[in-house]
């Protein structure tokens, strides 16, 4: 859909474009001008903000009021100047004599009463309707009607001569000093344009879409005005003192034969109700009932009578433009460039992964100048490179802007609003009569190995734990079971989350989609770190908690201790006067399972309103997703509202498609899935991320467009996240010392949640600043040949989590020497990767003393310099070893080398303790008897 422009929105609401631009700036949305286009969500926010501020319709009202005000005013005051001496018989050569009279006449004008103003407004509306009808007629047929319309003004002697120039062409032959030549007036109707000027040539005409201009000053230049500064006698001044209500248009001065230089004729009276669009007796343009004074109003001065146009001078700039240019000149420049600066509180909203070009568009600056500024701030980036929030904070602080990076939730909400999809509004608009009761969604949480999956096995009468590697849940499982309650079979949806510390994100996701949380605590272990974390997730999601004290049949079990420990975290058992239900269970024997289900249903009925609308398109969450070799992308989704049917067009995160098939947790086909029902969906184009929202759209095209936009947003966010910030100092140091060692990884897993958990855990490994971990690709499914090619180019290691490579990938990896490692337990992968990073560290060396020799004699040689005769006191002195000379405990020579080592006349490689030798230290000759020569070795220090 086409994006709306600012001036279109302003016209629709009825405000001025400047007001709309100012409101956009307050909202943090900076656009260049009224013709700039904005996103539909921003347009809706702008309309809401203007309506909330009460600004709608303020631009249209001032435009309409002045347009009608001059006519009634001129009409009511028309009889007053009628008593003046008739100016018709005056000589043609003396038009200036009337100027003093005209300036003196407006004095007796008196203010209008409220009744008169209302009558004038009614008359102006009638006149406007008649003007529209008369504008459709030709000038020849319109002129004879003018005298009849001006019967109230019959006493004016020039009324009878008004029809003379009805053809609208002023005669050049008449000696009128102030009348321009026909070719001098570009706005006159006698320029070969027939009876009416062409709309496109007249920027002041009423049909130019400029209705917001005050009509009182729109007449502009007047071709037959001999007195440029004379106001209309007796006419009101709607624009204040500076804008006189001059007779409307060029046609107000017919310049007939009987009026060589006289006042306006009766046919063009601005206040006449039947003037009908102003007959243009002197070649004016229609529909503009009033002109501004000399340079005092929107209509301009009388300069237009001499062919220069009556508009505002082009060389003059508005105060706003001058102020902006002055601020730009006075703004301090960084790096020799000038950029617009904020006041320190100017908010700029940017999407995740935005570039310098995006920031430049927001503040109306040049991207190249911003790149220069950023370079002088110590950051190197290109104009189109995705930057992180910290970099924008540095740049915004320097330029006086507050940077607000849109959160992923708000970004996705605005994206959907662009397709007229508002999930929150849908929920608010639902009435109680369309809501139906749905089953509760229960998440099982707790510490690792406390028996969560075993408890679910006991509830489902199945054995899930045998399918998990190492007995640790690696995925989120979703099941629906039926339990008897008060004589009825009630459905309960269970979500099993991992308890290992690596699966923090998956636990948080489980808490966000659940209604009730079952906190499983082992009676023998008590409270553990992941127990507290799961408790915090549930409390943050404002989810009621039911505590299942497991393993009560085990030796050393102490359920009372668990109750006491949880009291410290705000969970007080009912038997202690609290409101949290504690149930003692044994997943191994099945004891207390029925009591636990009853506690869940009682909690759901007591404090939760579990209702949703099943009669609409489905909305929900993708709990888990994987890539199946035979079925393609398979996503486990939980329907939160609506009904999902086979054949629906669906979009989940960056994946889209049609629902080809649905199955429950047992593999049985499902044709319709109602709220709170977990199903496995086939038919998606790719594997969605765990926790992505899904929704049903009317068309495949809409689903594809939403997915593509989400993919672009996610790609930019990943680029900004992967960018390593490097300053100029770091860059110089890297050039001198060599590049930083990095371990490149490619992660492939069976489900998206496990890949995400593994990636987050790996990125938390901190070994040393000299070694960094880079994940260049992650995905769901088997290791493919393209993964091996990518690993070959980037020297990466491929980590497969519960997946295996296909034959071609295995053969290519063997041929290229790519290391592929497979894991089924997540912490095994973490330990090995950490060991690999430790092995990549540069070795650390420490000084170790290898020997000490005392100088007994100094032999001086002209060929070899001074030779030290020594006796080895400790250790071993070796040739070419590093040495230092120590005198009275002070080092007098360092970084030396033992270049020659002899015993008597024989060269030797080493001399042991208590043996004598001769040592030559090269060019170092500052040795004395009693000095010590200490030799050292650099040995590698083992990493801890």
From Swiss-Prot:
It comes from the Bacteria. GO terms for molecular function: GTP binding; GTPase activity; translation initiation factor activity. Residues 311-322 have a biased composition (Basic residues). Residues 471-475 are annotated as: G2. It is found in: Cytoplasm. Residues 123-135 have a biased composition (Basic and acidic residues). Residues 55-81, 93-107, 136-153, 211-222, 244-257, 270-283 have a biased composition (Low complexity). Residues 82-92, 223-236 have a biased composition (Pro residues). Residues 258-269, 284-310 have a biased composition (Gly residues). Residues 586-588 are annotated as: G5. Residues 496-499 are annotated as: G3. Residues 550-553 are annotated as: G4. Keywords: Cytoplasm, GTP-binding, Initiation factor, Nucleotide-binding, Protein biosynthesis. InterPro entries: EF-G-like_DII, IF2_II, IF2_N, P-loop_NTPase, Small_GTP-bd, T_Tr_GTP-bd_dom, TF_IF2_bacterial-like, TIF_IF2. It holds the Pfam family GTP_EFTU. SUPFAM superfamilies: Initiation factor IF2/eIF5b, domain 3, P-loop containing nucleoside triphosphate hydrolases, Translation proteins. Residues 437-611 form the tr-type G domain. Gene3D superfamilies: 1.10.10.2480, P-loop containing nucleotide triphosphate hydrolases, Translation factors, Translation initiation factor IF- 2, domain 3. One of the essential components for the initiation of protein synthesis. Protects formylmethionyl-tRNA from spontaneous hydrolysis and promotes its binding to the 30S ribosomal subunits. Also involved in the hydrolysis of GTP during the formation of the 70S ribosomal complex. Belongs to the TRAFAC class translation factor GTPase superfamily. Classic translation factor GTPase family. IF-2 subfamily. PANTHER family: TR-TYPE G DOMAIN-CONTAINING PROTEIN, TRANSLATION INITIATION FACTOR IF-2-RELATED. This is Translation initiation factor IF-2. The gene is infB.
């Amino acid at each position: 859909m086409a994006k709306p422009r600012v001036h279109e929105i302003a016209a629709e609401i009825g405000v001025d474009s400047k007001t709309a631009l100012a409101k956009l700036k307050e909202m943090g949305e900076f656009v260049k001008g009224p013709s700039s286009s904005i996103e539909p969500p921003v347009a809706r926010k702008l309309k809401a903000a203007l309506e909330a501020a009460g600004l709608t319709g303020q631009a249209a009202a001032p435009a309409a009021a002045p347009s009608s005000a001059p006519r009634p005013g001129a009409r009511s005051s028309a009889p007053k100047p009628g008593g003046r001496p008739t100016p018709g018989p005056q000589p043609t050569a003396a038009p200036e004599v009337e100027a003093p009279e005209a300036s003196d006449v407006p004095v007796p004008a008196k203010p209008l009463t409220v009744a008169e103003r209302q009558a004038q407004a009614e008359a102006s509306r009638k006149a406007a309707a008649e003007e529209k009808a008369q504008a459709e007629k030709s000038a020849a047929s319109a002129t004879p009607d003018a005298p009849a319309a001006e019967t109230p003004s019959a006493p004016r002697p020039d009324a009878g001569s008004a029809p003379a120039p009805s053809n609208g062409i002023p005669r050049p032959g008449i000696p009128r000093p102030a009348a321009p030549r026909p070719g001098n007036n570009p706005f006159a109707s006698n320029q070969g344009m027939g009876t009416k000027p062409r709309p496109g040539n007249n920027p002041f005409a009423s049909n130019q879409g400029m209705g917001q201009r005050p009509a009182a000053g729109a007449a502009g230049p007047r071709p037959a005005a001999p007195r440029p500064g004379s106001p209309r006698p007796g006419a009101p001044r709607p624009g204040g003192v500076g804008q006189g209500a001059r007779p409307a248009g060029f046609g107000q001065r017919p310049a007939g034969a009987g009026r060589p230089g006289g006042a306006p004729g009766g046919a063009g009276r601005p206040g006449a109700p039947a003037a009908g669009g102003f007959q243009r007796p002197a070649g004016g343009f229609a529909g503009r009932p009033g002109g501004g004074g000399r340079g005092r109003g929107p209509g301009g001065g009388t300069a237009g009578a001499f062919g220069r146009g009556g508009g505002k001078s082009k060389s003059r700039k508005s105060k706003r433009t001058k102020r902006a240019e002055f601020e730009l000149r006075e703004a301090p420049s960084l790096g020799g460039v000038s950029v617009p600066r904020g006041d320190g509180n100017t908010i700029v909203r940017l999407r995740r992964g935005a570039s310098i070009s995006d920031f430049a568009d927001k503040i109306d600056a040049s991207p190249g100048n911003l790149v220069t500024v950023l370079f002088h701030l110590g950051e190197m980036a290109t104009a189109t490179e995705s930057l992180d929030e910290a970099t924008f904070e540095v740049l915004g602080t320097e330029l006086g802007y507050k940077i607000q990076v849109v959160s992923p939730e708000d970004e996705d909400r605005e994206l959907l609003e662009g397709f007229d999809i508002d999930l929150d509004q849908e929920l608010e608009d639902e009435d109680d009569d369309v809501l139906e009761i749905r089953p509760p969604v229960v998440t099982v949480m707790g510490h690792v190995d406390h028996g969560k999956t075993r408890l679910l096995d006991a509830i489902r009468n199945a054995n899930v734990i045998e399918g998990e590697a190492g007995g640790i849940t690696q995925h989120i499982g979703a099941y629906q079971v039926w339990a008897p309650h008060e004589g009825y079979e009630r459905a309960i949806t269970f979500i099993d989350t991992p308890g290992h510390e690596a699966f923090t994100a998956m636990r948080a996701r489980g808490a966000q989609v659940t209604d009730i949380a079952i906190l499983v605590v082992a009676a023998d272990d008590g409270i553990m770190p992941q127990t507290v974390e799961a408790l915090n997730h549930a409390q943050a999601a404002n989810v009621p908690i039911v505590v299942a004290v497991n393993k009560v049949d085990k030796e050393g079990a102490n359920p009372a201790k668990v109750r006491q420990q949880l009291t410290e975290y705000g969970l007080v058992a009912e038997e202690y006067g609290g409101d949290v239900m504690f149930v003692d269970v044994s997943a191994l024997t099945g004891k207390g399972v029925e009591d636990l289900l009853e506690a869940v249903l009682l909690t759901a009925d007591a404090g939760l309103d579990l209702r949703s609308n099943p009669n609409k398109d489905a909305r929900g969450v993708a709990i888990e997703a994987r890539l199946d070799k035979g079925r393609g992308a398979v996503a486990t989704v939980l329907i939160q509202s609506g009904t999902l049917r086979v054949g629906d067009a669906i979009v989940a995160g960056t994946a889209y498609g049609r629902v080809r098939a649905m199955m429950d947790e047992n593999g049985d086909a499902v044709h319709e899935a109602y709220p709170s029902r977990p199903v496995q969906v086939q038919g998606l184009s790719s594997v969605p991320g765990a926790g992505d929202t899904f929704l049903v759209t009317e068309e495949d095209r809409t689903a594809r467009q939403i997915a593509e936009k989400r993919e672009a947003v996610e790609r930019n966010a990943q680029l900004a996240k992967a960018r390593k910030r490097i300053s100029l100092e770091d860059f110089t140091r890297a050039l001198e010392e060599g590049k930083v060692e990095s371990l490149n990884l490619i992660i492939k897993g069976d489900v998206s949640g496990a890949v995400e958990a593994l990636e987050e855990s790996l990125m938390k490994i901190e070994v040393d600043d000299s070694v960094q971990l880079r994940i260049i690709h992650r995905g769901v499914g088997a290791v493919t040949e393209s993964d091996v090619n990518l690993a070959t180019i980037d020297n990466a290691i491929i980590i497969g989590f519960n997946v295996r490579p296909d034959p071609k990938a295995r053969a290519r990896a063997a041929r290229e020497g790519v290391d592929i490692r497979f894991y089924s337990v997540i912490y095994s992968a973490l330990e090995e990767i950490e060991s690999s990073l430790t092995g990549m560290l540069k070795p650390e060396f420490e000084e170790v003393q290898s020997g000490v020799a005392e100088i007994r004699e100094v032999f001086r040689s002209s060929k070899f310099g001074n030779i030290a005769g020594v006796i080895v006191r400790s250790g071993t002195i070796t040739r070419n070893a590093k040495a230092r000379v120590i005198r009275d405990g002070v080092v007098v020579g360092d970084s030396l080398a033992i270049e020659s080592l002899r015993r008597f006349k024989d060269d030797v490689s080493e001399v042991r303790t208590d043996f004598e030798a001769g040592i030559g230290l090269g060019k170092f000759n500052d040795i004395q008897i009693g000095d010590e020569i200490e030799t050292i070795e650099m040995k590698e220090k083992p990493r801890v």
